[in-house]
Amino acid sequence: MMRLSFNEEEVERAMNLYRVFARAFKSVSEHSIRDSKEHGFNPTEFAVLELLYTRGPQKLQQIGSRLLLVSGNVTYVIDKLERNGFLVREQDPKDKRSVYAHLTDKGNEYLDKIYPIHALRIARAFSGLSPDEQDQLIVLLKKAGIHSQHLLFR
């Protein structure tokens, strides 16, 4: 059963947690934003390239859901990256309704150069936490995200 009421202390703790989380997210995100701008991409374009580089070819719908983008934004970003030669779209031979995006040789070569530096900058951003603390934070953030997502559909 879903809780419908919270006492004042619980509400204040939740609001404090939200503010701390939002500030931390913004601070860490700035590292990625700086990297994307440094290489001539907007943050969404950089996120798409990073996803394809680290996870391989993706259905366009998967890109949207993984990066929390609406389909129009996905199409716009994919179009731009394709025009610039970083990725291509291909129809799934097994399901003609599905279209995959994958990096071109140019895209892979470019990410081979810039991704290691980007990953080190993100690692540095989290280096204030021990490896155990980072693992704990991953578990807690996943738990909070799943619970929050579940509440949206009640």
Curated annotation (Swiss-Prot):
Give the PROSITE patterns listed for this entry: HTH_MARR_1, HTH_MARR_2
DNA-binding positions are 60-83
Which residue ranges does the record assign to the HTH marR-type domain? 14-146
Q: Which InterPro entries match?
A: HTH_MarR-typ, MarR/SlyA-like, Tscrpt_reg_MarR-type_CS, WH-like_DNA-bd_sf, WH_DNA-bd_sf
Keyword terms: DNA-binding, Transcription, Transcription regulation
GO terms under biological process: regulation of DNA-templated transcription; response to stress
**Record carries keyword Amino-acid biosynthesis:** no
Entry coiled-coil feature ranges: none
GO MF, one term, reads: DNA binding
Is the keyword DNA-binding assigned to this protein?
yes
Q: Which domain of life is it from?
A: Bacteria
Please state what the protein is called: Uncharacterized HTH-type transcriptional regulator YkoM
